[in-house]
């Protein structure tokens, strides 16, 4: 990717020449600023983690939530402008959750002529068969979904699975691991799966959840709720979200500082004895 292309410059062209998804987007100064900020965040992550190789094919996971819609829209925005020379295939895995509106995502993708694959796999029955109703389904559900997405990526000849985790997801995961797992770990912008044949990419790791929420509302995406199964995300993650939002409220800018810290790690100044052979 050319690093000397300025997001501000190509957005000065206006909205007449843009991906069809943006044809009815707001033309306000506020939305322009939001869109440019998110695109800068995305390009920075793509550059920082060397995500891009020309001619690749990416499988973009689409759950129907605000973040996955935003991820797809911003990737298509860059691709439309010639700044993302990869083939994009959107993919939704219908996991058999009761009440899941099967028509929403296919209708949305077809309306914009976005290449896609919709697959049904009843992982919901597997999860409910293994866990009690009082337990949180999210972790097992996520692992089963990831396995199917890896398989689909291979079947479709994709080099990478692209996920919509943003800055706040990264920080919440870091503090969950710190407080409850006793380890320093978060969500990387780029990793290789255990089999070594697929990359997992997170181009939104620098994007704020607040910005993604505003973007989703402005674009009027047909959001599908994530709690159709009746399970709520764990109390631990919710507690981390509340803590981080409180810190940000009292000391604005701390979330960005924390993300910078995760990009500036000094292992020799930590206490992992495996790092010391002298």
Curated annotation (Swiss-Prot):
The pathway noted for it is:
tRNA modification
* Co-factor: note: Binds 1 [4Fe-4S] cluster per subunit. The cluster is chelated by three Cys residues, the fourth Fe has a free coordination site that may bind a sulfur atom transferred from the persulfide of IscS.
Q: Which PANTHER family does the record cross-reference, listed alphabetically?
A: AMINOTRAN_5 DOMAIN-CONTAINING PROTEIN (PTHR43686:SF1), SULFURTRANSFERASE-RELATED (PTHR43686)
Record-level GO cellular component terms: cytoplasm
Q: Which family does it belong to?
A: Belongs to the TtcA family.
Q: Which cysteines are joined by disulfide bonds?
A: none
Keywords of the record: 4Fe-4S, ATP-binding, Cytoplasm, Iron, Iron-sulfur, Magnesium, Metal-binding, Nucleotide-binding, RNA-binding, Transferase, tRNA processing, tRNA-binding
Among its keywords, does the record have Transport? Answer: no
From the UniProt record, give one GO term of the biological process aspect.
tRNA thio-modification
Instruction: Give residues annotated as binding [4Fe-4S] cluster.
Output: 138, 141, 229
Q: Which residues form a coiled coil?
A: none
Which SUPFAM superfamilies does this entry report, sorted A to Z? Answer: Adenine nucleotide alpha hydrolases-like
| GO terms of molecular function | 4 iron, 4 sulfur cluster binding; ATP binding; magnesium ion binding; sulfurtransferase activity; tRNA binding
Quaternary structure and interacting proteins, as annotated:
Homodimer.
Which EC number(s) does the record attach to this protein?
2.8.1.-
Pfam families named among the record's database cross-references: ATP_bind_3 (PF01171)
Gene responsible for this protein: ttcA
Give any extra note attached to this record: The thiolation reaction likely consists of two steps: a first activation step by ATP to form an adenylated intermediate of the target base of tRNA, and a second nucleophilic substitution step of the sulfur (S) atom supplied by the hydrosulfide attached to the Fe-S cluster.
Renumbered ranges of motif PP-loop motif: 63-68
Please identify the protein, giving its name as recorded: tRNA-cytidine(32) 2-sulfurtransferase
What this protein is reported to do is described as: Catalyzes the ATP-dependent 2-thiolation of cytidine in position 32 of tRNA, to form 2-thiocytidine (s(2)C32). The sulfur atoms are provided by the cysteine/cysteine desulfurase (IscS) system.
Q: Which cofactor does it need?
A: Mg(2+); [4Fe-4S] cluster
């Amino acid at each position: 990717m050319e690093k000397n292309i300025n997001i501000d410059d190509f957005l000065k062209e206006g909205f007449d020449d843009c991906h069809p998804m943006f044809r009815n987007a707001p033309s306000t100064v506020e939305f322009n600023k939001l869109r440019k900020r998110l695109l800068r965040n995305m390009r920075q992550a793509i550059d920082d983690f060397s995500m891009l190789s020309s001619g690749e094919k990416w499988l973009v996971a689409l759950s129907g939530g605000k973040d996955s819609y935003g991820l797809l829209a911003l990737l298509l925005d860059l691709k439309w402008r010639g700044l993302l020379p990869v083939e994009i295939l959107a993919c939704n895995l219908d996991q058999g959750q009761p009440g899941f509106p099967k028509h929403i995502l296919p209708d949305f993708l077809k309306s914009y002529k976005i290449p896609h694959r919709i697959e049904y796999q009843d992982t919901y029955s597997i999860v409910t068969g293994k866990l009690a109703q009082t337990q949180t389904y999210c972790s097992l559900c996520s692992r089963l979904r990831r396995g199917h997405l890896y398989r689909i990526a291979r079947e479709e000849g994709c080099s990478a699975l692209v996920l919509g985790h943003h800055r706040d997801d990264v920080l919440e995961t870091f503090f969950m691991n710190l407080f409850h797992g006793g380890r320093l770990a978060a969500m990387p912008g780029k990793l290789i799966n255990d089999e070594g044949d697929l990359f997992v990419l997170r181009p939104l790791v620098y994007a704020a959840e607040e910005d993604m929420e505003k973007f989703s509302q402005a674009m009027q995406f047909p959001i599908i709720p994530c709690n159709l199964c009746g399970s709520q995300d764990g109390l631990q993650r919710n507690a981390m979200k509340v803590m981080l939002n409180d810190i940000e409220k009292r000391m604005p800018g701390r979330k960005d500082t924390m993300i910078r810290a995760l990009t500036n790690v000094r292992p020799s100044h930590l206490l992992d004895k495996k790092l010391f052979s002298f």
